[in-house]
A protein has these predicted regions:
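C-terminal extensions
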Residues: 1-18, 22-96
């Protein structure tokens, strides 16, 4: 869902989350996440690595940005577009 349309109180399914459409919801389901509350405390980088392992494919690193956006939102931050996390992701990956 477009982050500007997200109403926290109405988030009950994965596609109610900011930046999550059908494909991203399917990725989350592959990770065993079927409820938005299960994102609380998750590491987006670990989620990405698990997704790549489960699908036996390397996904676009922007998937990390999407995961960062939803884990941030579920920890209480405001809904932001996924690209707001790109610079943070790039910085963290260069630190590793």
């Amino acid at each position: 869902m477009n982050p500007s349309k997200v109403i926290r109180e109405n988030v009950v399914k994965l596609t109610d989350l900011p930046n999550i459409g059908k494909a991203s919801a399917e990725d989350l389901l592959l990770l065993g996440i079927d409820n938005p509350s299960q994102l609380i405390g998750q590491c987006p980088f670990e989620m990405y690595e698990r997704l790549c392992e489960l699908t036996n494919a390397r996904h676009d690193p922007c998937v990390i940005d999407v995961f960062m956006s939803v884990t941030s939102f579920m920890s209480g931050e405001e809904a932001k577009p996924w690209w707001a996390f790109t610079d943070i992701r790039k910085q963290r990956l260069t630190e590793k």
